[in-house]
Amino acid sequence: VACVGVPSGGGGGPAGDGAGVQVTAGDCASALMVAAAAVLVARGRIAMPRRALWAFAPLAATLGVTTVASPDIASSLSGFVRDVQIFVLVPLAVVLLVRDRRDLGIVFGSVLGLGLGEALYGIWQALTGAGASIGGANVRAVGTFGAVDVMAMSLVVGFAFLVLTAFALVAPRYGAAAVPVALAGLGVLALALLLALSRGSWIALAAAVGLMLLAFDRWLAVKAAVCCAALGLVAVGLLGGGGEIVQRYASIAGSVSAPDQSVSDRYNLWAAAGRIWTDHPVTGVGVKNFPAYRDTYAGIELSSGSETDDPVNGYQRQPLLSPHDEYLLILSEQGALGLAGFVALLGAVVWGLWTRRDARDPFWLIGAAFTAFLLVNFLYADMGGPTCVLTGVLLGAAACRAFGLRRHPGPGPGLVSGEHG
């Protein structure tokens, strides 16, 4: 998890792009983790959980079939390896290596630590003008990822926000100081998310936190919604309707009636992906082949690329290499068969979380909220960049809670016991 925040020194494209393979420190660490899990399984130290095998095997199989059926197998091979890494090998390694609640607590604690570190650095960037450029000023918080991965920091901080929210809900059990400390941490994370100016992360986080609060206490969810609305009105009043944060928030409401160029490009990419799937409904055009078919199916309104700028990487123009919708990306590149594999995996995790639900267990709350965040975020974003490995780790952690842990010790400091069998 810590390696995810190590700067890669170069731009990366989303999963399924045609810009080559970007290997990050997180990828190297994940390879070591997968190798360690494989050695333990081969030596008989740990056994492959049957439920996890049945959840991940269909996705691996459909990825293999759609890759073999690709018009350009050589191009699709790297995409196959990447998708298997993120959606199969890394989560499965986490399921195999996490033994009990203490191990699961270490995973979530490391995510929280990374998120707080990125948040503090992002806030410093925004306040000192060292962030990514937006509106001609370098005030957008991007953390250690830089403008070339402009969405990465908001995802990491969003994941950390989910973890700390779950811990904050059970904080009263651990002393009077636990609640203000948790609230202070949430304040830091929330400020960084606002300064990241990521509309997609705001929407997905609102849905995930809303689900978490409703599951924990419906009355608390209502009070939290009222407080957030009041704080929003105060913020708008203080900013006088100006400022990048208010403008980005207002652009969410205007994304249908008056979309900006970014949203308009997204609509055109969605339409292109839909047309590709219509012509290749079963196995798609092959993983990583969306860019090769994009211009054939997209309208002339589509921009030639997006612009990024920051003091470290300078000005860069990046081509639009994916539809910015994971579901449409899967349908266009892997067809209905590929989507069936992903639905099987995510459905197994959701069903496992439902059957082992315990709204008083922070680990269950994190697993459910992360899954909701992912499902909502995939509606207008796709997998890409250095946060892929972190997503795979958290998917594995959610699967641990969904499928049951191998050992069930009593709760350690700061942990709450729940149903895991």
Q: Predicted regions span which residues?
A:
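A membrane-periplasm/extracellular boundary helix in multi-pass inner-membrane enzymes
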Residues: G187, F216-A258, R275-D279, V287
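Transmembrane alpha-helices of multi-pass inner-membrane enzymes
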Residues: L365-G421
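Transmembrane alpha-helical segments and their membrane-water interfaces
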Residues: M33-G44, L59, L63-A119
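Transmembrane signal-anchor hairpin modules in multi-pass inner-membrane enzymes, especially those
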Residues: V1-V65, R102-G109, A168, A176, ...
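Interfacial juxtamembrane loops and adjacent helix segments
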Residues: V256-V263, K288-Y327
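Alpha-helical transmembrane segments of multi-pass inner-membrane proteins
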Residues: A60, G105-A137, F145-A215, A348
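Loop-to-helix entry and N-terminal half of a specific, functionally important transmembrane alpha helix
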Residues: L321, D325, A344-L345, V350-Y380
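A conserved mid-to-late transmembrane alpha helix and its immediate loop/hinge
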Residues: A190, S306-W351
